[in-house]
Amino acid sequence: MGETLGDSPIDPESDSFTDTLSANISQEITMVDTEMPFWPTNFGISSVDLSVMDDHSHSFDIKPFTTVDFSSISAPHYEDIPFTRTDPMVADYKYDLKLQEYQSAIKVEPASPPYYSEKTQLYNKPHEEPSNSLMAIECRVCGDKASGFHYGVHACEGCKGFFRRTIRLKLIYDRCDLNCRIHKKSRNKCQYCRFQKCLAVGMSHNAIRFGRMPQAEKEKLLAEISSDIDQLNPESADLRALAKHLYDSYIKSFPLTKAKARAILTGKTTDKSPFVIYDMNSLMMGEDKIKFKHITPLQEQSKEVAIRIFQGCQFRSVEAVQEITEYAKSIPGFVNLDLNDQVTLLKYGVHEIIYTMLASLMNKDGVLISEGQGFMTREFLKSLRKPFGDFMEPKFEFAVKFNALELDDSDLAIFIAVIILSGDRPGLLNVKPIEDIQDNLLQALELQLKLNHPESSQLFAKLLQKMTDLRQIVTEHVQLLQVIKKTETDMSLHPLLQEIYKDLY
């Protein structure tokens, strides 16, 4: 496995990761001494005392490097704060002008508003073959299997293409007064009646929604399908209650949900727009305007910007671990596992969950910080000197692809539970009960995705692939920390962060 990140001794007054996490699980006390990786979900910089970070007993025990090669840096890097502060009124005016210019260049991803419905929260034990699945939605025109939501209705590829060609080429068919029946085998016999059927069921050129559907239509469809499933499988009612419990726990555990984050990113909120940080001047202004949580400017003005940001992320990570731990305890069966296995599952799972939920705070241009009060641009983060400028780019690349799946909070609630209950983590003592719980969660996830995203037949397989991608991101993150270990001789790393990364990949 991987080497220990940081060879310095852990402060005798600090608990080990295992002891702290065990106490948190068994005694329901708040965990505040566990550290996690860079840029966790719901990131914010706060006023926690950083004296522990300045204690060099926690620093890397490495001889100073006399030379560091930064020749490959393409963007400018920034050295130390403080900077000379300009008159506040002048600074605000310049910021407003620059912000208008920058915001005009930012293309925020379209909102796909997360929505929760009890009808979408289903567990179902039996695995159904696609051909016999209750989720095989019929084409509204001919009754064939629908491939998605096209031109305002569920339609198969054949009828979608027929309608598109008719509209695009402005085709006029010979009138037929026979009112021909349109079904899978006869749909090509009478084009006039087929087109009339398309119009009758609601197909419209003004309702182009390839792969999407209105929320009202989705809820109606889910209600019909859920009713059918309940009649065929009475156990689904109990499973739905269980799924709702998971969703409720998710909402309680994670204050900044994807629904809230996307509302901020797309401007669909009554709250004040986030303060955009895109360069050093806007960063200084942001420190005055944003209620940062983990760093106060007066405490850390002497430190380099990249290090200040990195240290602030460490303290927010403590909160992230607490949130994830609380959620894990709500997963049915988790607290009944061996206590050592609970600790191991969280040790390996929290990183992957942090990056999963971090994606909710991101678009291709930047990331929300400080509980949505600020928005730090991707280019600014890349401009930080190496290796710090390299930390976030893999997370952005993952987030753009992950967000394309258009999951909502009800999907994520099950997905992160699946991540936690991974029976292949190294060092587990009793794998069987863990796999049993995960199998149930996987069945729940598969059915949830079929119900919530009926137009995306391959979504379950794509999401499972993301679990592999997340592990690769964690591995790359550990490798970057190894670089910091070798090059940043005066960089303090929280001792519990070293504990978590010990023997991790």
UniProtKB/Swiss-Prot annotation:
Record remark on domains: The 9aaTAD motif is a transactivation domain present in a large number of yeast and animal transcription factors.
SUPFAM superfamilies with a match to the protein in the record: Glucocorticoid receptor-like (DNA-binding domain), Nuclear receptor ligand-binding domain
GO molecular function, one term: zinc ion binding
Top-rank taxon: Eukaryota
Activity control note: PDPK1 activates its transcriptional activity independently of its kinase activity.
Modification type Phosphoserine: residues: 112
Signal peptide from the UniProt entry: none
Organism ancestry: Eukaryota, Metazoa, Chordata, Craniata, Vertebrata
PROSITE patterns, alphabetized: NR_LBD, NUCLEAR_REC_DBD_1, NUCLEAR_REC_DBD_2
Primary role: Nuclear receptor that binds peroxisome proliferators such as hypolipidemic drugs and fatty acids. Once activated by a ligand, the nuclear receptor binds to DNA specific PPAR response elements (PPRE) and modulates the transcription of its target genes, such as acyl-CoA oxidase. It therefore controls the peroxisomal beta-oxidation pathway of fatty acids. Key regulator of adipocyte differentiation and glucose homeostasis. ARF6 acts as a key regulator of the tissue-specific adipocyte P2 (aP2) enhancer.
Span of the annotated motif 9aaTAD: 495-503
Domain annotation NR LBD: ranges: 238-503
Location in chain, cross-link Glycyl lysine isopeptide (Lys-Gly) (interchain with G-Cter in ubiquitin): 252
Protein name: Peroxisome proliferator-activated receptor gamma
